[in-house]
Amino acid sequence: AAEGITRHTFVGFTEPQDFLLATNREQRGVTLEEVKAVSASVRRSEKLHPLGVLVHAKDVRPFASIRTYRELLFPVRTAQPVPEDALGAAEAVWDSNLRELLTQAHRETTPFYFRLEIKSHMPLDKKSTFARRFSAELERLSGRMLVNAPSDYEIELRLLEKRDGGYACFLKLLTIAHGRFAYRKNAVAASIHPATAAMIVALAEPYLKENAQILDPFCGVGTMLIERDIRVPAREKYGIDIFGEAIRGARENASYAGEKINFINRDYFDFTHAYLFDEIITNMPVRGRKSKEETDTFYGRF
């Protein structure tokens, strides 16, 4: 952590705000239905957005616990379009509702440490130059109310390239407590994102059986099984993986989640059990370094 950084306390907004629950483009309807399940006393409106679900509400926190979105972002409303040059973009972003969003939502008035992320087709070297110039100019314009700290930050500014040129700007607040996936202390390279696992389970919910006996033959760090049990409680849960490090991580994750799951470090094809399972739920291994023939053989055996 950078020395002297003062953490800010999120206290909520005094006025209703727009915020985006970014999610899988093809499954936005699932998240929309979960938004509609939040008390109408909090919600003002909600609608589909190209990146997810756009919500207008007086308190963001009841929505933060929804499991099927990837990120919670606030649209930064600029007075002028955000241009493609770094200095002009910084000026446009500062001439917006950004300062109001930050000061209204936090108790402390100390500087906010930020990181800039640019989603564009710009070459990496030009993107780095843009980020450096943008960040320095935003620091200057804000009188160092905003301080560039890419390795230890509380807020993230996201610039998304628009089809018609320029950028759309979003704000991500790391000051909002997100306990949804706090159990996931361990992951490996092939691990599924927990929000993706939650989305898959939400889509499968009509077919899930309460108190079922479930098997994940390629369980990794246990994310699919944990999310399955959170959505619809199961009776017996078994996770198998040939990768010992993943199984160790899965046991820890399940413990953090308060889940009782039987994890076995073994090749699925060598596994036998005394009774049949009601469900198999898994994130199947991808091809990776295997040849197409090896992958076809693997899936054929499965």
Which residue ranges define each predicted feature?
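Charged, low-complexity, helix/coiled-coil-prone segments
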Residues: 65-84, 135-148, 192, 243-257
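Class I S-adenosyl-L-methionine-dependent methyltransferase catalytic core
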Residues: 1-62, 121-125, 151-154, 161-302
